[in-house]
């Protein structure tokens, strides 16, 4: 027999009053005796804390707080602990003799909430010799010890060999270990289970009949029939899911057209926009590539134009430079012509002026002679006039003197003044400041002598002048001629220079005679030189255009080569034209073929899509129409085979369903009639009696009873006989066994057990041999096992049936799809791929375009080469006639030589022309230059000086004469002399004076006439001189100008200059013409460059805009593609046939679909908002989001248990296949799942009956319990009247309420609740829902009422209530009920725990003073009978005779409070024996 586990000891560490105390627990009763505050409740609290370490439940209160709803803030635990680490440990030994120490580490948490920290732990494998206090304390000295923290305790235990230490983070794990090791009776899986356990302990602790326990006895004693509840829940869940699925199918059927419409329009809306963007992206890419090609071509053209522009600009610059030179040359030639013409005119002027000068020279010489004669006559007239003047003056003086004498007094002063004036004038003229009237006579003689001397000298010089005049005139003429020819020179050098000039003149005349021949020769050579230079220019230009330098000898061969090249290029150009026409014709044919293929491509793509769908659906590849027709025949055969297999699987599934239904009957009856017969006979089915048989024992009992497994056990067979008469509604073989259903055993047979078989000796002459069945069905566990296997098989069959049904309908739809394909697309599906051909043709078209472009480039190059060759030939035609000139290298030297000789000759001609006349004049008179006559100029100066001296001497003598004459007047300073003489003298003087004045007048008249004539002569001479000088100066200027002109004004110079000018003009005109051509070409080139630049700019802008648009679109397109691929909708959106529609058609298609979608999603707010957002043309990804949202919406609407795909399109295709099949299957499944109301009533009744039997068995254990007036205690289990009525209606009158159970809107639980409300309208259901009420009605415990009854004295059986029992009786009754609860838990948990473990049993009782000695003895007896341990807290006057008693006394020693404990074992006549180790000295925690 298995020994029951026991609690060995309780250890308290650092509790209030207990520093390290171990209480050894008795195998039956341990009594804690002591006064108030001794520590009894603290000890029990430590035990309970170690047993249930849940702070949410622990609440230690005094018995006076038994009815209180709240105690102290710390619920009694914080105050029972001391500061620091505390422990409460239970030392146990289980049925396996394993020592297990479980406990908790407690520690106060600082704070006003007075919390406690609890850590549960367990120790296994601890040797028996080790005491718990030794584990958690460390002795410091004889009087002090230290409590080890939990981590040190762990380290200490890990150091011990074979000892296991476990620390738990959850109370559930802690209790799970305690349950597995047999410390507690029930597995506490949840807080609710812990609460029940705690309430049980609390009820036993405080004693009496706990109202909490009494009210919830059903929860404590009646196990939860989780299997039945789970079955009902599974059934309802399956029904609910089935109905939801059916409803979903109905909704799906109603929404199928909406789905199709929504998917179709959404696909059209998004796919059209998707393909439009794809087409636009392709178009944009093509445009970008085209722009890039055009940009590259334009750049090449611009570069070519720029090179051309540079060449033309360079040529234009050369022509501009040459034009400048030519203009300069032309202007120089024109200027030279003008200079020649000017020089000729100047030469004519010079000749004319020279003739005039010769004439003027003659006239000037003649006028000089006339002037000289006039001067002589003028001098004579001046002398006569002066003599006449002197005579007049003398006569006037005489007359004045005479008058003065006449009137001295009047004239004396005047005379005196005149004398003074004459004296002053004489002083001034004679330079004699000391001159006086007295010495005037002396000075007069002197000055008269000087006058005479000067006059003589002047006359002598005049004579000399007359003689040298003639010789001086010839010398001056010759000298002037030499000076005019040679320039200024000394007079003594004139002779040598004149001879040299004459000799040079002869040489110059000889050279001047060669000017005309040299000029003609030079003109001819210059013409040849110009032609040579033109040829060299043409050759240089030709070499530059050819890009190569050629020798003169190579030009003829080059000319022939260029002519041959021209002929060849001409043939190539004509052939290229034909080739270009052929290429263009092929290009047009390709374009036409591409257009026809693009028209055929959508039809072919639609056929290919249909073919691909067929290939995907059937997993085959079709290469021809024959393959399609052959596969269609195979499809028909496969359809027939699948239908046959489906029917077979369906039959097997129905058989399994029937077997499951049969095995699911309550009580294990395979025939419903047996249940009715058992109720009719008042018996019990044998299968119900053995319903709890284990799965291991099921084969044995099944073989033991054999065919009588389904027998009915009745108490008395004789009472059944009358019922057997006329019995027809029964199985063919009905077995009846007599026996007590409450104590039935298998002793009715004599059995011999064999290997996997039994031999049953039914009678002496009848044995039955039965083997153990492979699949036993005897007992609930066996049936459940079989049902589980059948359910698994049914699931497989159902899945296979569904798969086959789906395959059949899929095959049928595939057959329809093949038929549609054959009718619509078979004709074009297996034709060649037009898109592949289009790609090939496009590739060929690109090649043709590239060939055309290359051909155009080659043709252009050939044309350029042809033009270059023609230009080269033209240039060579101009160069070849001048090859001899190009070969003449000495021509320039000869021209320079002739030009030098011509310059010398022209210089000589100019010399002769300029100085020929002077040389001719000089030649006859050159000899006068050999000797120079007197210095004629000096002589002239001496003569003029003598004349001046003579005049000065004459004036001085006249002034002195006047002074001398007025010498007398100086004496008349005071008065005037008296007038002397007579009147006659006066008259004579007057007459003579008149004559003298007349003569003087005549002389003056003659002098004035001669002076005027001389003045005229002088004027004529001056005019002639001025004219001569002017003309001479003009002539000199003209000669200088002619020299400055620097040209030779001969007869042929003008003609040569004009020819040169005309040639340069022609060259300038040609140059200007070429320059104009180049300027026009350059302007055109610049315009072309500007156009190309603008085009290039526009192309660059368009290209970059397009590239940016492509890049931007690429980012958006990548997002779209990523979204499409992530959501797996590319196959739906990338409809290749739409690629051949225009953007307008696609936009129109998308807009039409958008209008339809707006109506379709008008009632769906989410899709409406997403659709509205998707209308943004700049955000194409939003259309994909809308499409995904539509798919997601459809996925949510389509149940995945109905349709096996995530694709709504495929779901719609599968939907039509699945809907009808699922509807039938689910309808039948609902009928099978829906358990009948009678079955529910039978299940609940059988469960109630079984539990009633179990309670009866528990009551048998309490029959012998008695204390006080209580003779016995029992539990009474009754069915509530309202629920009994419900069971009767469910089993007998359920047809009246089928409106509830057949309603698809109500679950079975709700229908059950509605029926309960219908039967009991007086009951208020409150706020509970019908589902909650129905679930409660499916729990059999709610059908039962349990109450405790006691057999007390003469009153018989009474309901146990606190008011009807004494305190001791109430405590005993409550303890009995608690023991029953523990027994019930053990029975319930036996199958969950190992069979070799019997759990510990321990209860508490605080304040046992309320019991008398007999009641306590009864408790001892109860504990002994039930192998239960009990801890009692009692006052000091209680001394049980049995068990272990601890005397607790609380003492204070040196301010330290501790509990003194003395333990006693038993209570006999002998002296009490002190238990070892119970004395504890006061200890102080270190």
UniProtKB/Swiss-Prot annotation:
Which segments carry the region annotation Flexible hinge? 666-783
Q: What does this protein do?
A: Plays a central role in chromosome condensation, segregation and cell cycle progression. Functions as a homodimer, which is essential for chromosome partition. Involved in negative DNA supercoiling in vivo, and by this means organizes and compacts chromosomes. May achieve or facilitate chromosome segregation by condensation of DNA from both sides of a centrally located replisome during cell division. Stimulates both DNA relaxation and to a lesser extent decatenation activity of topoisomerase IV.
* Protein name, UniProt field: Chromosome partition protein MukB
Q: Has UniProt tagged this entry with the keyword Transmembrane?
A: no
Q: Name one GO cellular component term.
A: cytosol
**Outcome of residue 1381 to L?**
Abolishes DNA-binding, but remains associated with MukE and MukF
Under Pfam families, the record lists: MukB, MukB_hinge, SbcC_Walker_B
What species does this protein belong to?
A: Escherichia coli (strain K12)
Read off the domain note: The hinge domain, which separates the large intramolecular coiled coil regions, allows the homodimerization, forming a V-shaped homodimer. The N- and C-terminus together form the head domain.
Q: Does the keyword Chaperone apply?
A: no
Q: Where is this region: Sufficient for ParC binding?
A: 645-804
Signal sequence: where? none
